[in-house]
Amino acid sequence: MLKIRVMPTLLSDGTKLIKGVGFDSWRGIGSPLQAVRLFNMRGVDELVFLDIRATDERRSPNFELIDGLADSCFVPFAVGGGVKSVEDARGLLLAGADKVVVNSAAVENPPLVAAMVKQFGSQCVVVSIDVRNGKNVTIHSGKKETDKNVVEFAKEMEKAGAGELLITSVERDGTMQGYDIPLIRSIADAVSIPVIASGGAGTYEHMAQALRDGGASAVAASSMYHFTGQTPLLAKRYLHDHGFQVREQWGQDAPHAR
């Protein structure tokens, strides 16, 4: 059995970190650099950084910002936001990203994912899919609903060569009430590439449910790390204690999560 991954998600407006609920009611929550440094000390398996305003503001990714963050990131670093071309993806990788996350452009320019895979390999390409009502793919930070069914789109992205899928429930985002397990399960059953559960994590048990009942390979979370005392390290400890194989990064005296 492959080891599961625990990964914080950092959302940015291009300069500062922000967080909302249901892709709305955004508020500033701090410095990207401080967060990257903090999470690097907290036993994360991977870090996801998304500039959620870049596409709507028709900006390219902030390569200078990513370059600075990558200097302080010593775990796999997945970066997205504003990726519209192979050159955007190349710029992020040159700036220090290990993986490129593509969202709206995967829907609006379907050949892009295959082109990125051809240039950089599947292991570098993550397709982020935001889902409303458990079935409809949305783009532009949830503002625009498409007619694409999420399961069929997930299969299309796998066929295009995507290395993994980041699945976020718009309604669950920021609520800390738990992941959309049926949504995650439907996609995990339809594809053979890793599925990252996102949107709604509020407890370590929510993560266990996404892995056990949803079939996810990894769990992403944001609000529960920013607004509670819960940490990725304790999440991994909890999951380990409940039978999941994790990358162990704690000392013998680390507390057990409850």
Labelled PLM ranges:
Residues 46-65, 104, 109, 166-178:
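Glycine-rich, proline-tolerant flexible connector loops at the mouths of alpha/beta enzymes
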Residues 53, 61-120:
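Glycine/small-residue-rich loop that forms an oxyanion/phosphate-binding "nest" at active or ligand-binding sites
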Residues 11, 39, 47, 79, ...:
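Conserved, mostly hydrophobic/aromatic
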Residues 73, 77-99, 182-219:
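Catalytic cores of alpha/beta
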Residues 5-9, 46, 74-78, 99-101, ...:
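Structural preference for beta-strand elements that scaffold enzyme active sites
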Residues 112-120, 209-221, 225-250:
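C-terminal helical cap(s) of enzyme catalytic domains, especially alpha/beta-barrels
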Residues 12-19, 23, 98-173:
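Conserved anion-binding
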Residues 60-67, 110, 143-152, 177-186:
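Charged helix-capping and loop-helix junction motifs
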